[in-house]
């Protein structure tokens, strides 16, 4: 059964139990102190990578420097595009906070890649531009058609390519290079988790270097600074731990761990979530009962309908396996 | 001030319906669960925004509807969409996929495949059983727009469901 099949919502008794139990746990644990500052290792790793990157890519860069105009970081033209796409959805001239956050993520990966002196070739930029323009030929019911968009932006096809297509393509090509480079940093890591780890590094970089510019854009577009995203909770048993990720399955009995395979337990309990392995207790072991706070899903696996990937805010061990 | 055990009673009554509603928006069960969890916590934290005289069912539906739209605009959703286009996953053929789909599944999957704007009004009209005027208020669009989207949605469904006798389509 694929994820997008109505049969997955036939019997929601397990889903209901999970949601109710997570909400109650969350509310009951409000008083607990927030965890220590996150991402210290990530930041150190980032600084180290940047230092090494600076040396290596300086020479590489000289050979690859292009005549193309390098678009600015936090390019407002892209925000204008988001604004039009949002207007299509909400019928008002209002930018969603979620879109502003998207913009920051997009710009952060570009700024971070630039800091690593990753410069795309003209061929890579052209390929990205072709890909970006092809995107508009796909049907997507959450956005206007290409022609409608041109009307909304009041530009011609050529104007759109020049003002939006090319700067975005340059950035897409740049962060393609960043993803490629990240494969060396995060070997044997699932794609959603690796992407999330790199995004965290990139966002930290952007916030450190462009703090004032971000604040000014927030003010201009009336975007609330407060993070409206709630912290959600997933409780369950750790069934697998890898170098950069760990798997939590809800509803598993202690007696089942080790008796059945991980796949069997995921199928039996119809859930399984991989989280990034960051800032977690060193004693974490398979069989531990844990509670993980997260903000959102970061990917799924169509080949395994019950498996998904989520980000992480913090986690704690409720009961150790032995 | 609502107490946790009172919230539990509310969740007992509304959770499955709200997960289903979120699913029809975002078309992914795990994300639908997250959205409903998020909505309950927001509801608990912002009780002052809920007027007792209003209908709780409609209020919770509105929160789920808005949160689902936020999700559809999120970086994560867009990224997953792009990943799926660029790296199409190999689909494992499972035994239950080979089973003939019943009529109800065919109808629901046809609705899931509708464009967003038509899908949204169809969900509220047929599954949430909301009158047009309430849908218009919920989505902050004119009643005439709701009716147009319903009509277009039904036309698209008729094309998809030519061999299925769904009374909704027969009587329209």
PLM features per residue range, with description:
Chain B
Residues 18, 22, 47, 60, ...:
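Hydrophobic-face residues of short alpha-helical interaction/recognition segments
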Residues 78-107, 112, 131, 170-171:
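Internal acidic/polar
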Residues 1-20, 36, 44:
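A short, charge-rich alpha-helical start-of-domain segment used by transcription regulators
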Residues 65-83, 100, 152:
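Arg/Lys-rich amphipathic alpha helix in sigma70-family domain 2
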Residues 121-125:
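A short pre-motif secondary-structure segment
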Residues 34-41, 54-66:
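Structural recognition of an alpha-helix C-terminal capping motif at a helix-to-coil junction
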Residues 48-62, 77-80, 143:
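Short, aromatic/basic-enriched loop-to-helix "N-cap" motif that marks the start
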Residues 1-8, 79-82, 137-140, 154-172:
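C-terminal edge and immediately downstream basic/flexible tail or linker adjoining helix-turn-helix-like DNA-binding
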């Amino acid at each position: 059964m694929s994820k997008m099949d109505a049969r997955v919502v036939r019997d929601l008794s397990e889903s209901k139990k999970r949601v109710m139990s997570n909400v109650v746990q969350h509310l009951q644990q409000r008083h607990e102190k927030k965890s220590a500052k996150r991402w210290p290792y990530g930041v150190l790793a980032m600084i180290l990578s940047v230092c090494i990157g600076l040396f290596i890519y300086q020479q590489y860069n000289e050979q690859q420097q292009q005549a193309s105009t390098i678009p600015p970081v936090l390019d407002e033209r892209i925000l204008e595009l988001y604004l039009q796409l949002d207007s299509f959805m909400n019928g008002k001239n209002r930018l969603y906070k979620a879109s502003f956050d998207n913009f920051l993520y997009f710009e952060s990966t570009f700024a971070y890649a630039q800091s690593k002196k990753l410069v795309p070739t003209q061929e890579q930029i052209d390929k990205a531009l072709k890909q970006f323009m092809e995107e508009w030929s796909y049907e997507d019911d959450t956005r206007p058609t290409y022609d409608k968009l041109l009307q909304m932006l009041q530009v011609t096809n050529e104007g759109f390519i020049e003002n939006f297509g090319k700067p975005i393509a340059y950035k897409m090509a740049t962060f393609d290079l960043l993803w490629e480079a990240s494969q060396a940093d995060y070997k044997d890591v699932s794609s959603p988790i690796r992407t999330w780890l790199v995004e965290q590094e990139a966002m930290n970089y952007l916030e450190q270097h462009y703090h004032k510019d971000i604040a000014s854009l927030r003010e201009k577009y009336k975007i609330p600074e407060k993070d409206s995203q709630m912290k959600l909770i997933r409780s369950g048993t750790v069934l697998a731990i890898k170098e950069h990720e760990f798997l939590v399955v809800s509803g598993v009995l202690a007696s089942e761990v080790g008796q059945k395979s991980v796949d069997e337990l995921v199928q039996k309990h119809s859930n399984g979530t991989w989280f990034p392995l960051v800032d977690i207790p060193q004693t974490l072991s398979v069989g531990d009962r844990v509670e993980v706070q997260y903000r959102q899903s970061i990917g799924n696996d169509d080949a395994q309908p019950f498996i998904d990937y989520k980000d992480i805010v913090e986690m704690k061990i409720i009961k150790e396996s032995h | 001030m609502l107490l946790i055990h009172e919230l539990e009673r509310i969740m007992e009554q509304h959770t499955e319906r709200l997960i289903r509603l979120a699913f029809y928006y975002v078309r992914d069960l795990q994300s639908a669960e997250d959205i409903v969890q998020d909505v309950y916590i927001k509801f608990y934290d912002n009780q002052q925004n809920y007027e007792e005289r209003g209908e709780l069912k409609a209020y919770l539906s509105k929160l789920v509807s808005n949160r689902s739209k936020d999700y559809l605009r999120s970086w994560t959703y867009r990224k997953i969409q792009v990943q799926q286009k660029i790296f199409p996953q190999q689909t494992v053929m499972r035994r239950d996929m080979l089973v003939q789909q019943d009529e109800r599944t065919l109808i629901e999957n046809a609705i899931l495949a509708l464009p967003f704007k038509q899908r949204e009004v169809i969900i509220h009209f047929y599954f949430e059983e909301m009158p047009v005027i309430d849908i218009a208020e919920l989505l902050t669009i004119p009643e005439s727009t709701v009716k147009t989207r319903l009509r277009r949605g039904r036309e698209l469904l008729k094309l998809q469901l030519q061999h299925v006798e769904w009374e909704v389509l027969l009587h329209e």
